[in-house]
């Protein structure tokens, strides 16, 4: 059996990574001495995410100086491969600089204006609509509206005004009116619905208008057999005024005295 001469392993593989030690500034550096285990702390940044975010933010804004934590020495873990491409850290830095640029976010740009969040989350409001100001008690009074108008004249804003600002007649609406505004205005004719008509027919109109006139086209063509009413005053026999009048009681004719006498037998 042929034996191969022993050859020493390459120094590249024989080199072991230096031990890592955690410094108080939450960065990893190589430690020459033995590492003493430390208790785990949930408030300690073991991964150094704060450093990455600070570097990315400082790299994206050249006018600002480096952060307070960027002044300390930072050393990453030793590289095991000496032939690594030197352009990878730059590419990673550019990626982090674009991905972690928090100042590019619209919400982090500065303090939000008073009406900005209201307009953004207006679609998520379950009471969005005409009656929202009445139910939630946020309808402005006359003095508030006048003050807002004067402020708008001094410092005009480009944002559109709320929907309830253009309708001052809702300010004095009662609770019943607010409840009615929340209900969907569906047109249902009870006469056609009770007669088993199609849904497409009885949802296009109502039975009677606010003034009491009959609006149903089917009922308007009907003529009451008792009173002959039709058109605006059309109704069925059940709702006819004559059907509610009790009929006169019929009394039997009075009996005569001759009929009251007992009959005699004829011989």
Curated annotation (Swiss-Prot):
Binding sites annotated in the UniProt record for Zn(2+) 2: 224, 227, 235, 240
Region (Disordered) residue spans: 57-94, 243-267
GO cellular component: cytoplasm; perinuclear region of cytoplasm
GO process terms (BP): cell migration; cerebellar neuron development; epithelial cell migration; mRNA destabilization; post-transcriptional regulation of gene expression; regulation of cell growth; tissue homeostasis
Keywords: Cytoplasm, Metal-binding, Repressor, RNA-binding, Translation regulation, Zinc, Zinc-finger
Compartment(s) of residence: Cytoplasm, Perinuclear region; Cytoplasm
Expression by tissue: Expressed in the oocyte. Transiently expressed in eight-cell embryos. At 12.5 dpc, it is re-expressed in the central nervous system and the expression continues in the adult brain, in which the hippocampal formation is the predominant region. Expressed in the seminiferous tubules of mature testis, but not in the primordial germ cells.
GO MF annotation terms: enzyme activator activity; RNA binding; translation repressor activity; zinc ion binding
Locus of motif C2HC 2: 224-240
Function: May act as a translational repressor which regulates translation of specific mRNAs by forming a complex with PUM2 that associates with the 3'-UTR of mRNA targets. Capable of interfering with the proadhesive and anti-invasive functions of E-cadherin. Up-regulates the production of MMP14 to promote tumor cell invasion. Not essential for normal development.
Family under the similarity heading: Belongs to the nanos family.
PANTHER family assigned: NANOS PROTEIN (PTHR12887)
Name of the protein in its database record: Nanos homolog 1
Organism: Mus musculus
């Amino acid at each position: 059996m042929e034996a191969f001469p022993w050859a020493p392993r390459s120094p590249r593989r024989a080199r072991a990574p230096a031990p890592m030690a955690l410094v108080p500034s939450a960065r990893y550096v190589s430690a020459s001495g033995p590492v003493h285990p430390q208790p785990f702390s949930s408030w300690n940044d073991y991964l150094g995410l704060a450093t990455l975010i600070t570097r990315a933010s400082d790299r994206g804004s050249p006018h600002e100086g480096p952060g307070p934590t960027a002044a300390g020495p930072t050393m990453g873990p030793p590289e095991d491969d000496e032939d690594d491409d030197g352009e990878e850290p730059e590419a990673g830095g550019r990626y982090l600089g674009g991905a972690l640029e928090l100042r590019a976010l619209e919400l982090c740009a500065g303090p939000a204006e008073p009406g900005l969040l209201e307009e953004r989350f207006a679609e998520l409001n379950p009471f969005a609509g005409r009656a929202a100001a009445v139910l939630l008690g946020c309808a402005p009074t006359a003095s508030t509206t006048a003050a807002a108008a004067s402020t708008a004249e001094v410092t005009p804003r480009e944002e559109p005004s709320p929907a309830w600002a253009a309708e001052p007649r809702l300010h004095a609406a009662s609770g019943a009116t607010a409840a009615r505004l929340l209900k969907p205005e569906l047109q249902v004719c009870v006469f056609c619905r009770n007669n088993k008509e199609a849904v497409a027919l009885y949802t296009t109109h109502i039975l009677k208008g606010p003034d009491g006139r009959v609006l149903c086209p089917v009922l308007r063509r009907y003529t009451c057999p008792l009173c002959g009413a039709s058109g605006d005053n059309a109704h069925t026999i059940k709702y006819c005024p004559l059907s509610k009048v009790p009929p006169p009681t019929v009394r039997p004719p009075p009996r005569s005295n001759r009929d009251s006498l007992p009959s005699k037998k004829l011989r």
